[in-house]
Amino acid sequence: MKITNPVLKGFNPDPSICRAGEDYYMAVSTFEWFPGVQIYHSKDLIHWRLAARPLQKTSQLDMKGNPDSGGVWAPCLSYADGQFWLIYSDIKVVDGPFKDGHNYLVTADAVDGEWSDPVRLNSSGFDPSLFHDPSGKKYVLNMLWDHREKHHSFAGIALQEYSVSEKKLVGERKVIFKGTPIKLTEAPHLYYINDVYYLLTAEGGTRYEHAATIARSSRIDGPYEVHPDNPILTAFHAPSHPLQKCGHASIVQTHTNEWYLAHLTGRPIHSSKESIFQQRGWCPLGRETAIQKLEWKDGWPYVVGGKEGLLEVEAPAMSVKEFSPTYHIVDEFKDSSLNRHFQTLRIPFTDQIGSVTENPHHLRLYGQESLTSKFTQAFVARRWQSFYFEAETAVSFFPKNFQQAAGLVNYYNTENWTALQVTYDDALGRILELSVCENLAFSQPLIKKIIIPDEIPYVYLKVTVQRETYTYSYSFDQQEWEKIDVPLESTHLSDDFIRGGGFFTGAFVGMQCQDTSGERLPADFKYFRYEETTE
């Protein structure tokens, strides 16, 4: 059997992999999307299912007002002492000389069980991880952020002991690794293998220069010797390789005594409008997760098949275990809670923004703030996970003024999105409006307004994504569809387009209701269909 990469498609970056018996788990970053952290489960490293979203409460994660691409960065999941340990950052500032953020620890007996309230650890840098030393001690590592003028912001990897009984860091903080000439050293994971400490880090930034570096030492606090063929993982030297941005990795030893590395990757698409300065492409699916096999030579791990990684990887020698789908193609909102694959922005899904029970078999969203808000949006969405798909919904919405709108949205962040919405025109009544926001440049490109007949209870909305472009359509009866002849660029919903590539999520599609008049006018969505297609 083969592992086919990426194993986690769509926005699923910064994988932290661990094993509990014969079960395998990966935690990935969620940034400003709520609930915080996604944990996937596998029995064979081939098939993965979304098993849990552990940070469900605002006592664990309060992101209201967080910036775009703030929130949960680089969680680290581990299993020790009969329980799961999850450590994560909540980043409050992403621009400028400071990187304000706080690092927390939560625990649970099972990944899909109740997670504890958080222990606040420190705020000295991001990408924290927890290491369980064979001595019984526990240590927290994180990159150290230095805001000072004439100092490099990435000041190295810091190590400090954590007291389980006192629930706090104790002893001296020590920088144990300053990184390599690749620079931008972050994402530390520490392993103890055959009496040697191995420190795995990410370097080079999280764009196309991304890489994974490994170093080793006989002592936990160093000094650390760098791998003789470092970096052990990168695709920067191979611009035509289908897996790009390879880096930010973690390691697991299987119960069959094989070694694998989970890592971040991106799959770029190219556009006819591409300039000579953008030769690497765009990744609208965001940063995804792939798995590579490792082999050991002279006490060092190497990626089998080359340091850029493979699309198909030899699977471990264990029984294959497939899972039933956790997301149905059509969701008719028959359950008492949202499907796990849906998320909201910054805040939990509560009756402040919506309900799946108030109008049976509907998702009701109460009009809140606009798509540019970092506070209270009524927006329920899921990831783009394919370059070719359709998403469709039906909305019942009767606005009374132009500040009320509801519909289908494709979204990257508050500065980059498109929306086909039912809204109101003073002269025409209910209409459909297409809105486009690209790096905060706002436009409404429809020349002729689409009038909705008074007797129509539901307006059907659809988006068709075909690799580098996507288009909206609408119908008043779900039979006859009218395509809106405004092709939109998928590349504009990618890390690589957003203000020059400084952000970290991926494209989402979903349902939204806004009422900037403050009346909270509700919209009822009858279903949501997400279906992957072929070229």
Swiss-Prot record:
Beta-xylosidase is an intracellular xylan-degrading enzyme. PANTHER family: BETA-XYLOSIDASE, BETA-XYLOSIDASE-RELATED. It comes from the Bacteria. InterPro entries: ConA-like_dom_sf (IPR013320), GH43_C2 (IPR041542), Glyco_hydro_43 (IPR006710), Glyco_hydro_beta-prop_sf (IPR023296), Glycosyl_Hydrlase_43 (IPR051795). It catalyses: Hydrolysis of (1->4)-beta-D-xylans, to remove successive D-xylose residues from the non-reducing termini. The keyword rRNA-binding does not apply. One of its GO terms (molecular function) is xylan 1,4-beta-xylosidase activity. Belongs to the glycosyl hydrolase 43 family. CDD domains: GH43_SXA-like. Keywords: Carbohydrate metabolism, Glycosidase, Hydrolase, Polysaccharide degradation, Xylan degradation. Oligomer; homotetramer or homotrimer. The active site is at D14, E186. GO terms for biological process: xylan catabolic process. Its EC number is 3.2.1.37. The keyword Hydrolase applies. This is Beta-xylosidase. The record marks D127 as: Important for catalytic activity, responsible for pKa modulation of the active site Glu and correct orientation of both the proton donor and substrate.
